[in-house]
Regions:
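Predominantly extracellular beta-rich ligand-binding scaffolds that present long acidic/polar faces
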Residues: 1-169
Length: 169
């Protein structure tokens, strides 16, 4: 299976892609199976497989984010009709972090997506740092009053978070 994100930055259109992932490594910053950052369209894609390891970041500007499809779905990003069947087991650095079945952090639009995998996240020694974990997205944010859309999605898997300051959805 795929060992690293397929694409660093998507600004185009990715469609009808099937990816089997086998990430088992220490990862830094933002990670997703298909793309680290999405500013384009990702449609009708499916990811399966296993993700495990330790995630860190520089803690100043870039924090650890993991998503089954995209690590971060930016304001212009659209993820539509995608499925994640991943088994995720990550240990996060003691800093603010995000993990989601489809996107770690969603500032754009995610619609008609399904996540059925297992998400297990552990963070130790990070009492003051929030860990945002969700079946579809770890966190949804608006930017300048725009974006941050999640509609007609389903998570039918299991989520387990072991952290002192966690937010689970």
């Amino acid at each position: 299976g795929l060992k690293k994100p397929l694409i660093a930055m998507n600004q185009g259109k990715i469609r009808n892609l099937r990816v089997v992932a086998d990430f088992n490594d220490d990862m830094q910053n933002v990670q997703g199976v298909i793309t680290q950052y999405n500013e384009g369209n990702i449609e009708d894609c499916m990811v399966t497989g296993t993700i495990s390891g330790y995630m860190g970041g520089n803690g100043a500007v870039v924090y650890p984010e993991f998503g089954g499809i995209a690590g971060e779905n930016a304001l212009a990003g659209i993820i539509f009709g995608c499925t994640s069947k991943l088994n995720v087991n990550l240990t996060m650095a003691p800093m603010k972090s995000w993990v989601g079945g489809i996107a770690g952090l969603n500032i754009g639009t995610i619609s008609k997506c399904v996540s059925t995998g297992t998400i297990r996240v552990t963070q130790t020694n990070g009492n003051e740092y929030p860990v945002y974990v969700g079946g579809i997205a770890g966190e949804i944010q608006k930017f300048g009053g725009m974006g941050g859309v999640l509609k007609e999605c389903l998570h039918a898997g299991k989520i387990t978070v072991t952290a002192a300051n966690n937010c689970v959805g």
